């Protein structure tokens, strides 16, 4: 029977076998090509839409942190703040006490106006400090803290501190470290431009949370924000996000990568902000995204099997 199919003597039978074979080949090629083109089309459309959403989110984040930077700059330029950062605490005791009162009133005013500023700390290069809502845990100078040193090294640029764990400051209201992101900036003498201290602001994450939660990436995707150190700044409740490798989204200002997590394929799309050094990341369950293509592949396989059975039976 097999020999008869492979080497038929009847011309009509030969034509049937040939036509069935060609039909099978055309079906497989067209189905594979169609699926590939459709899958690439979905990937490109997903990439373009996600990039647009992420760039809008990053622009909004830039505006939020630019506002923080402007407010820090304005606070640092107040005459009483400038004088407080330069005062000699030991030899100018009376002046120091009065300046502390004035600066503390300023900090309270700022915290009332900007309710998202959970904590504001002013630290002089001499080690003295004032805050609206925190106190020093250990009697070690805050100038030795990493966040202070980072601000000095940034030379006047706003720095986002990735974590406040281990910081020598504790808030009276006892905010969780998951509730805010710390920003620090060097304050310079208005006359000499020399650094005279640092201002730290703990920004409530709710403003960022609202932006990220508004990101809609279809039924199979979600978004999150990652800082320059690879720490997740904010993400929705999701077991996948904490299995992401930060190095996957560090190649260039934007891009995409396919990765495998817990046996599933994910399409990862990312975009980076030069101003904040933050990265917006979109993650899609690629298997669910192309379920329609998978069904089409299954149907095409069954069609091929039916054709082969028909050819063999003929």
Where are these regions (language model features)?
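Extracytoplasmic/periplasmic sensory segments of membrane signal-transduction proteins
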Residues: 48-156
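Extreme N-terminal signal-anchor transmembrane helix of membrane signaling/transducer proteins, especially
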Residues: 2-44, 48, 305, 309
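Solvent-exposed, extracytoplasmic
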Residues: 102-111, 134, 198-235, 239-240
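Signal-transducing alpha-helical linker
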Residues: 33, 49, 80, 301, ...
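Extracytoplasmic/periplasmic ligand-binding sensor regions of membrane-associated signaling proteins
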Residues: 112-114, 126-202
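Membrane-proximal, non-catalytic sensory/regulatory domains of signal-transducing membrane proteins
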Residues: 152-188, 220-222, 243-276
């Amino acid at each position: 029977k097999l020999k008869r199919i492979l080497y038929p003597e009847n011309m009509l039978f030969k034509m049937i076998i040939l036509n069935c074979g060609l039909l099978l080949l055309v079906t497989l090629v067209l189905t594979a090509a169609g699926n590939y083109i459709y899958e690439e089309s979905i990937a490109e459309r997903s990439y373009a839409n996600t990039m647009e959403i992420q760039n809008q989110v990053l622009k909004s984040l830039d505006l939020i942190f630019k506002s923080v930077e402007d407010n820090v700059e304005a606070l640092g330029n107040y005459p009483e703040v400038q004088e407080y950062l330069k005062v000699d605490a030991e030899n100018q005791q009376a002046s120091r006490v009065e300046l502390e009162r004035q600066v503390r009133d300023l900090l309270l005013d700022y915290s009332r106006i900007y309710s998202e500023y959970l904590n504001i700390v002013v630290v002089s290069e001499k080690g003295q400090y004032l805050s609206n809502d925190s106190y020093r845990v250990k009697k070690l100078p805050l100038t030795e803290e990493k966040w202070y040193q980072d601000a000095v090294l940034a030379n006047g640029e706003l720095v986002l501190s990735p974590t406040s764990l281990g910081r020598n400051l504790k808030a009276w209201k006892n905010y969780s470290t998951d509730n805010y992101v710390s920003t620090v900036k060097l304050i310079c003498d208005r006359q000499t431009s020399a650094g005279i201290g640092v201002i730290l602001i703990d920004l409530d994450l709710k403003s960022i949370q609202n932006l990220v939660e508004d990101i809609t990436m279809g039924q199979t995707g979600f978004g999150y924000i990652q800082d320059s150190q690879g720490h997740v700044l904010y993400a929705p409740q999701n077991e996948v996000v904490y299995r992401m490798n930060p190095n996957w989204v560090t190649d260039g200002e934007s891009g995409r990568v396919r990765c495998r997590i817990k046996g599933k394929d994910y399409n990862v799309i990312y975009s980076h902000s030069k101003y904040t050094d933050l990265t917006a990341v979109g993650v899609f369950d690629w298997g669910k995204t192309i379920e329609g293509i998978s069904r089409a592949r299954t149907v095409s396989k069954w069609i091929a099997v039916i054709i082969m059975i028909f050819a063999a039976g003929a």
